[in-house]
């Protein structure tokens, strides 16, 4: 069930290399047909400039997730294709060395440093989620396969009316949780 009116972005069969993030706007369904393969670069600098995000419960401006939406309504990612974030290329090694940046971010949150001053971009080490929705509503993720996330796989934050249905996640790096709703209401996750 997709609620959009604007239209579909259809990714047909084939391998598509992406250098940088893909930003979803309102009323759009990103539809991956069978045997469509989105292959992200897996290189940290390709996911700059920083975007408003949340990392383990603390807001910041950091590396963009591979697929990102902010304040969008009626958005979907559907189909039978595959999204490969290539999280192991560069990001996997970060889990061992991100402790100081993680601690610095948490201290900034505890001290109530304004989010706009919590900048963790180039030269910092906090892995991004693969797919993140920030402050969005009426979201559908259905049927796709997601591989090799650098961190949490699907991460809705401050969202409402989220459906995640019949997806496959194949990711074996540290913290590759499947779906991590944070401060989000009306969420349905089902096979």
What is the meaning of each model-derived region?
Residues 1-191:
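Extracellular/periplasmic carbohydrate-active domains that bind, remodel
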């Amino acid at each position: 069930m997709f609620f959009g009116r604007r239209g579909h972005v259809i990714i047909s069969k084939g391998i598509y290399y992406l250098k940088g993030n893909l930003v979803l706007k309102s009323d759009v369904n990103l539809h991956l047909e069978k045997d469509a393969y989105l292959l992200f670069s897996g290189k940290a600098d390709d996911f700059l400039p920083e975007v408003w995000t949340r990392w383990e419960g603390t807001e910041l401006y950091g590396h963009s997730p591979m697929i990102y939406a902010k304040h969008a309504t009626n958005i979907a990612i559907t189909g039978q294709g595959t999204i490969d974030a290539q999280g192991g290329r560069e990001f996997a090694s970060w889990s061992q060395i991100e402790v100081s940046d993680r601690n610095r971010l948490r201290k900034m949150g505890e001290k109530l440093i304004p989010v706009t001053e919590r900048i963790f971009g180039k030269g910092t080490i906090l892995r991004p989620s693969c797919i993140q929705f920030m402050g969005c509503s009426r979201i559908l993720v259905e049927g796709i396969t997601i591989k090799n996330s650098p961190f949490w796989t699907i991460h809705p934050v401050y969202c409402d009316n989220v459906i995640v249905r019949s997806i496959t996640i194949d990711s074996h790096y540290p913290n590759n949780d499947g779906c991590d709703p944070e401060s989000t209401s009306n969420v349905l996750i089902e096979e």
